[in-house]
Every structure is written in C-alpha cells, then in structure tokens.
Amino acid sequence: MSDDPKTEFRDRLESIRTGMLEVDGRFLPMSHNVIEGDPKLWFITARETPMARAAAQGARARYLICSDGKGLYADIDGVLAVSNDEAKLDEIWNIVASSWFEDGKRDPDLLLVSYTPGEAETWMTEGGALGFLYQIAKAQVSDDKPDLGTHTTLNLA
C-alpha cells in the first residue's frame, strides 16, 4: 500500500472497471476510464441517456465504487461535463464501448463525458475476504480491535 492515500486510491481505482453513477437520484451502472496523470474519470455513453442530459448541464453527481477484490469502497462527489476531445476518446476506446456503438468512435449517438472528482470518502482494506476473516478471528482471541484498513476523506480537486 502506498504511503499517499490519493496515490493508493487512484491506483486501486485504475484496476476497477465499474461503479454506480448517481444522476438525478437514480444510480446507473457505468464503466469508468482512468488515464494516468489525468485527474478526471472518463465515460462513454449514448446521447439520450440521463447521464448525457446531466453532463450537458454540468451537473454534480456521485460515483460509488465497491470492490472486495481490490479492497476499495468509495463515495466520490464530482461534476459531469460533455467533452469533444477526440484524442481522449481514442485513448479510452475499447472493445466494450464498440459493442454499444455500431459506427464505432464516430457513431453520432456516442457522447464522451468527463467526471471531475471533488471529494471522495474512501475505505481501503488489505487482504480481501480472507484478510477480513483473519482480522475478525484475531479480535475474538485477543484484546485487539480488527484492523480493517483506512477510512479517509480525500480532496481530489
């Protein structure tokens, strides 16, 4: 684990592919894209979706991550925006995205959306499910409290 919580958060987030994006009180499953050196998360969506409408208005949104395998649980607050950055689209384009858009990256229904995180409440654990069970068992036979990782609020702006 990195000594810097922001670095550790980004490293773990990069290895996770999905989360739940809250738009107008409704949670939508989405695949995010993390680009090294870029503080934003990137999404590809269709133009007539709740996410597209929210991005067109520069709306605030929450993105929730829950990954036992990577030991990251996060509630991220941020702002959505529509982007016309073709180089960014080229960088994040993948086979999953191509499954949704018949005409590929030039599909008229495709919309690139950036998500600029502001603050994230995070919980980071080590050892996955086995680590959790070990900590609980250890607490039962000792006077120690279980060490279930770190809980922090990160300013990502």
Question: Which functions belong to the PLM regions below?
Answer:
Residues F9-F27, A61-I65:
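A short, Trp-centered hydrophobic/proline-enriched beta-strand micro-motif
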Residues V34-E36, M124:
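Short, low-complexity Ser/Thr-rich regulatory SLiMs
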Residues G37-W42:
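Short active-site oxyanion
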Residues M51-E119:
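Short, structured beta-strand-loop surface elements
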Residues P108-A157:
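C-terminal edge-of-domain segments
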Residues P29-H32:
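Conserved beta-strand in the GNAT
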Residues M1-T18, T153, A157:
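N-terminal leader/targeting segments and the immediate start of mature chains
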Residues I44-A46:
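Short hydrophobic/aromatic beta-strand micro-patches
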